[in-house]
């Protein structure tokens, strides 16, 4: 299989503005693996987003062994008017899937989507309109996080991953008033020109996660803008269980650390909060075997964290009118996010770069 190899571009080259025709051609790229539950809904939400003659959807599948490929095939048959392509991704990682799909894309504009995402009916059209204004290199819309299952824990997870106490200031996931555009560090499901992707050398395939933040960091390092527009949105289905959530955030933290090692200037102080919390727990707990005063210091730290988690759990569930069960579960979900992300971030800092 041919592939696009990431190459380090000159991040300081002069920025170029892009003016697009109203109906620029669009290619939607969806990396996926074993997504039989969600891929059909994602395709259904994307099918009528844009004039079919200027539009294609490319599903880059990591050799799924469930019914994902069958669902895509059935959708192709039921929508003969729409160009839907299914490409194989034996590498089974997201940055490779994106590079491979974009290299094969025919569109001037690339829309990076996810099998867990359900964009509003005007998502693609609105992104193209904003790009066409020539004021931004990358455009995205807010995510409305939905439960990944009809269970109390899934509802609690959906609340946690869209709450500032859970995930910090990821603005594309946080509720905001008004329809104003905003400059941001990154967006979840970005639209950008294929020429920009080429100029940047593609997505960095050394980063198996966090490749989108890295891409947008390199865009901003060129002096160009990443804009969050709020006139459309995308529903995103969160992980349904604590085990899957922990696995997701363990992966996020580890690869965030790897990105920071490669690009130290991308570090934000807020990204050190969870690792510092985990490190302090570990150090105080270990030191307590030698000096009991360390355990005495650990107790108020954990009590303060628990109090904050309970406070924000009550606040969030009351605001969203969630049941009492969600409020009881939220502190455990918050801790799962912070401990998984913080632990894996520290692990990513100390392990060799070649270790996956």
Regions found by a protein language model. Give the residues of each.
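Catalytic donor/gating beta->alpha subdomain of glycosyltransferases that bind UDP-sugars
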Residues: 147, 204-267
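A conserved acidic beta->alpha catalytic loop
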Residues: 45, 61-70, 91, 114-120
